[in-house]
């Protein structure tokens, strides 16, 4: 099938590449001509495990193409995916200008029936808005479909190729048949393609992300209570996770959620509720807890150093909002770095993938280490902010010899408490006993 993907950000590139992998002819379009040229030459502009191989293979086999010309991209496409940014506006609502602008441009170019699919995360009612914009600019027949993505950064290729479900919002029979055909190779093991109306589909995406964010904030609250009552959050997590009604996933406490989805989507859903005169109290609490949780580790650091961080040097392991990605959008590490710098501290950081993005954002306000151990040199303490696998089993002998003080503030609960006792560390984690 011939497909066009408008937008070559994270969602657009994963979508386009994975659709090409099953034999579709895919043209991805982006207004950034320099980026398009780079991709035409086989250079992948994002880091995502497993994507580079598929990306390069489908370019070589001439199933994946890139252009900056919208007319060229959609000319023969039967389905057009909109994978465009919907950044939060000043009031927290999603900015639909990119989506609606693309819809208008596409409408003016239509010559035959096509299916327009919103892959971006959009508020309820967006499909209706896209339809109105397009009808004002064309008399050619078309269908607008909601098909939200449920990709997890770090495992996005697997999520697309073997989805646990595909949600499609459409009441158009032709569009339904086309989407069922398109996704059939990805659901051969029986995972469902769930068809529904457009508004339910749009809300499903926001509801899913907001529920997961709620689980995270709830467990962070439990972790904070554990520290006060002398309980261990890891034991509590195991105890409640064994209940199949709750499940084991998204029960890890830490320093708050980040990334391109959860913060934006929770805020947008709360704003959508507000616009419909509904006070979504739980989501307000979820956001409040998350902001507070980002400050927890710095407060612990300040208490240890008696409130004076001026002239102190801190090593930081982890900058990305989660492991296996270079994405730093709303990363807790950025908030923690800002607080430490404002307190007069110096920082040496290491992250396997995200240092370039951080340097592009904040420049030389901090130093960037060649490896995790270089970051420890002359450091008064180590802060662990992202649970990269490389940080889970470090060379403790090298740590002992390199750190100025054997002091660790662990925002991801990576290490066994008994081991840290045996090594003679001051070890302050989240929701567990303080080792001092």
Predicted regions and their residues:
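Structural/interface elements that position substrates and couple domains in central-metabolism enzymes
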Residues: 1-436
């Amino acid at each position: 099938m011939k497909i066009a993907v408008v937008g070559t950000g994270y969602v657009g590139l994963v979508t386009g590449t994975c659709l090409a992998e099953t034999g579709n002819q895919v043209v991805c379009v982006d207004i950034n001509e320099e980026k398009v040229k780079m991709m035409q030459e086989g250079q992948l502009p994002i880091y995502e495990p497993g994507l580079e191989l598929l990306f390069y293979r489908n370019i070589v086999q001439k199933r994946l193409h890139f252009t900056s010309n919208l007319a060229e991209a959609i000319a023969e496409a039967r389905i057009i995916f909109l994978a465009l940014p919907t950044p939060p506006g000043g009031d927290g609502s999603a900015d639909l200008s990119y989506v609606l602008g693309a819809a208008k441009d596409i409408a003016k170019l239509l010559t035959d029936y096509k299916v327009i699919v919103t892959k971006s995360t959009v508020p309820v009612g967006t499909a209706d808005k896209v339809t109105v914009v397009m009808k004002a600019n064309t008399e050619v027949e078309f269908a607008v479909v909601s098909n939200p993505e449920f990709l997890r950064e770090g495992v996005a290729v697997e999520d697309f190729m073997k989805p646990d479900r595909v949600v499609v919002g459409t009441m158009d029979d032709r569009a339904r048949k086309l989407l069922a055909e398109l996704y059939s190779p990805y659901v051969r093991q029986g995972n469902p393609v769930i068809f529904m109306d457009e508004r339910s589909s749009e809300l499903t995406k926001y509801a899913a992300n907001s529920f997961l964010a709620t689980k995270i904030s709830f467990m962070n609250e439990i972790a904070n209570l554990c520290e006060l009552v002398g309980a261990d959050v890891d034991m509590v997590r195991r105890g409640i996770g064994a209940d199949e009604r709750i499940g084991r996933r998204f029960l890890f406490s830490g320093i708050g959620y980040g990334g391109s989805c959860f913060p934006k989507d929770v805020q947008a859903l709360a704003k959508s509720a507000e616009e419909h005169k509904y006070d979504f109290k739980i989501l307000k609490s979820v956001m409040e807890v998350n902001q507070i949780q980002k400050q927890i580790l710095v407060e612990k650091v300040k208490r240890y150093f008696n409130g004076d961080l001026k002239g102190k040097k801190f090593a930081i392991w982890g900058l990305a909002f989660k492991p296996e990605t270079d994405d730093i959008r709303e990363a807790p590490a950025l908030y923690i770095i800002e607080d430490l710098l404002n307190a007069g501290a110096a920082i040496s950081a290491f992250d396997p993938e995200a240092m370039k993005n951080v340097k592009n954002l904040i420049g030389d306000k901090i130093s960037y280490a060649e490896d995790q151990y270089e970051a420890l040199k002359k450091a008064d303490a180590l802060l662990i902010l992202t649970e990269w696998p490389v940080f889970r089993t470090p060379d403790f002998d090298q740590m002992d010899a390199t750190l100025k003080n054997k002091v660790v503030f662990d925002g991801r609960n990576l290490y066994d408490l008994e081991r840290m006792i045996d090594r003679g560390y001051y070890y302050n984690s989240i929701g567990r006993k303080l080792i001092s």
